[in-house]
Structure formats: C-alpha cells, structure tokens
C-alpha cells in the first residue's frame, strides 16, 4: 500500500509507557475544506473497523492559515498525553516548534498532506517522517494534460495555495514544469490561500489584468471552484480552461460538464489512514521503511472525468 524504499526511520517513542490501546490525534487544516472532511471521514471509518487497536481524536482549524489555532490544538494533545500525532500542518515552518515539543514529550509524530520544511526540522534536531504524495508530480500530470489543449505562446495564470506551505510550492513547481515544457507563458502567480472565495477573487483579478489568459491552474479544487465562478462572471465560460487538485466531490460535476478540465486525486480518505498505520507501526516498535529523505510516498493520479 505504501511505497517502500531503503532507509528505516528512527523510532524515538517510549514504548514501555504505551497503553494497550494507543491514543492517536489527527490534526488537520480547515474543516471548511471538503478535502479535510473527507480525510477525517476516512480516518473515522478506519478507526471503527480497527476499534480494538487505537482511539482516535480528530481536530481541525477554522481556516487554512490559522497556525495559532493549530498550535493550540497540538499543545492540547501534548497535555492529553496522546501516543501519536498525525498532522497536516497549516504552515511548513511555523508549526515546527510545537511539533518539536510533541516529539520531546515522547509523542510519535507523523507528517501528512503538507510536508514540514526539512531544513527547519533538521535545525530542531528532530526526525518527522512524511507520509504523502509527490505534489510536484501530481501537478505536473494535470499541467501536461492541460498543455495538450493549449498551444505554445498561450498565456495562463497559477492560483497558488498558502505560499508558505511546501505542498503549495511543489504544486506550483509542477504546473510550471508542464507549462515550460510546452512553451506556455505563466503571466500571473497569486495566492488564493486554498479557499473558494479568495481563489475566485484572484481569478477575477487575473482575468481582468490579463484578458488573453487561456487557462487557470488552481493548486486545489476549492480555489478551482472559485475560478470557475470567476470565469463565468467574466463571460469567458468555455474560453478559459480551469484545472485543480484534490478530486473533491464538489469538482466532480464540473469535470463531467467541462467547467473543469482536470484535477489530481491524492486519495484524501486514505491519507490520514496511511499516517495512522505508520504511527501504529512505530508505536509497536516495528520497522518502517522510507526513502533516504524520510518520505513514505503515497499515490496521486490524474483525473479528467
């Protein structure tokens, strides 16, 4: 299920103190984002099927940039003496100090969805395995599919997620890889903070400033939904392509009727489960295989209908 490679992750948890039924905390980003609701549902369904193996505590924050709120949740989980923390960090750098507190408290920490900044993690002298997809590869797949509908010299805009997050940066890089290979010009790059309304505002601004834009590449499907509304409001439906990333339920009818050309599925319902499975292995003292960079890669696929 998980891609295995050469290096084994170090195990730093105190096994002797682990109760028979470990408590695992799932800490996500905004539960206003359908992607994280799907992730939570998947984790709860898995726990129900494995209720004898662990207890699950799940939490999310009010919006995608609420690092203070997410920090408070992690601090509460430390006080609650959970055995493992599976976290999709709201910020790749700002969340590292509180994650170090969790590691120092003997909690097994697994990073999912958005990778913590490796340099900052290293500077804190901790090891936090990342369980998740190759975001750059996923975005490149979407971008390459879009490029086939365009021609060299066409102009496009990229609506990025929260710019301080690794997954936003990686998806932008993947989109750019595909556009550069096809000689398509990225004329605008702005952050939509992963959110529908902000994504729509950014899309409207791009369409107004660059009337020749032929496509909008959104770093997630929530922003793609906003972009679809902006395209319609600008009277450019059918003339400006929109692509996204996540394959949330809200995007599926738009893929069917052509309002959205493509997205990437990174299997939200399974992402937290991958992290939980890894945490349980470490808690039990089992060997967990990963790449040399501490990454356990999970699937990502192009979706066009």
Model-derived segments and spans:
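Short, low-complexity disordered leader/linker segments with a strong preference
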Residues: 1-23, 55, 100-107
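Hydrophobic alpha-helical segments within soluble ligand-binding/sensing domains
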Residues: 24, 70, 129-156, 198-199, ...
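Hinge/cleft segment of the Venus flytrap/periplasmic-binding protein
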Residues: 20, 159, 163, 167, ...
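Short beta-strand elements in bilobed, periplasmic/extracellular small-molecule ligand-binding domains
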Residues: 49-63, 155-158, 176-196
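Hydrophobic alpha-helical
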Residues: 84-104, 175, 187-188, 192-253
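Extracytoplasmic "Venus flytrap"
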Residues: 23-50, 57-73, 82, 88-92, ...
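Flexible loop/hinge segments that line or gate small-molecule binding clefts
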Residues: 92-93, 97-137, 148, 155, ...
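Short, solvent-exposed amphipathic alpha-helices that sit
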Residues: 35-51, 138-142, 166-185, 202, ...
């Amino acid at each position: 299920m998980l891609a295995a490679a050469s290096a084994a992750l170090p195990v730093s948890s105190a096994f002797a103190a682990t109760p028979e039924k470990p408590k695992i905390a799932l800490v996500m980003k905004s539960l206003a984002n359908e992607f994280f609701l799907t992730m939570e549902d998947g984790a709860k369904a898995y726990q129900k099927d494995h209720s004898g193996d662990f207890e699950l505590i799940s939490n999310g924050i009010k919006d995608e940039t609420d690092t203070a709120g997410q920090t408070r949740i992690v601090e509460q989980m430390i006080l609650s003496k959970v055995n493992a923390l599976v976290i999709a960090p709201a910020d790749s750098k700002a969340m590292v100090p509180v994650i170090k507190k969790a590691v120092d408290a003997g909690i097994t920490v697994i990073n999912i969805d958005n990778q913590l900044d490796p340099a900052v993690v290293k500077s804190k002298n901790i090891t936090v395995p990342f369980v998740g997809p190759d975001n750059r590869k996923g975005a490149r797949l979407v971008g390459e599919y879009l490029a086939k509908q365009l021609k060299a010299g066409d102009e496009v805009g990229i609506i990025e997620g929260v710019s301080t997050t690794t997954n936003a940066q990686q998806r932008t890089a993947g989109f750019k890889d595909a556009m550069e290979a096809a000689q398509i010009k990225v004329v605008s790059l702005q952050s939509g903070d992963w959110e529908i309304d902000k994504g729509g505002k950014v899309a409207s601004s791009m369409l107004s400033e660059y009337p020749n834009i032929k496509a909008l590449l959104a770093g997630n499907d929530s922003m793609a939904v906003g972009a679809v509304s902006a395209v319609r409001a600008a009277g450019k439906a059918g003339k400006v392509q929109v692509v996204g990333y996540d394959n949330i339920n809200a995007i599926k009818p738009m893929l069917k009727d052509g309002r959205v050309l493509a997205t990437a599925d990174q299997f939200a319902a399974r992402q937290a489960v991958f992290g939980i499975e890894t945490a349980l292995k470490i808690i039990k003292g089992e060997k967990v295989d990963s790449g040399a960079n501490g990454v356990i890669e999970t699937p990502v696929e192009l979706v066009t209908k």
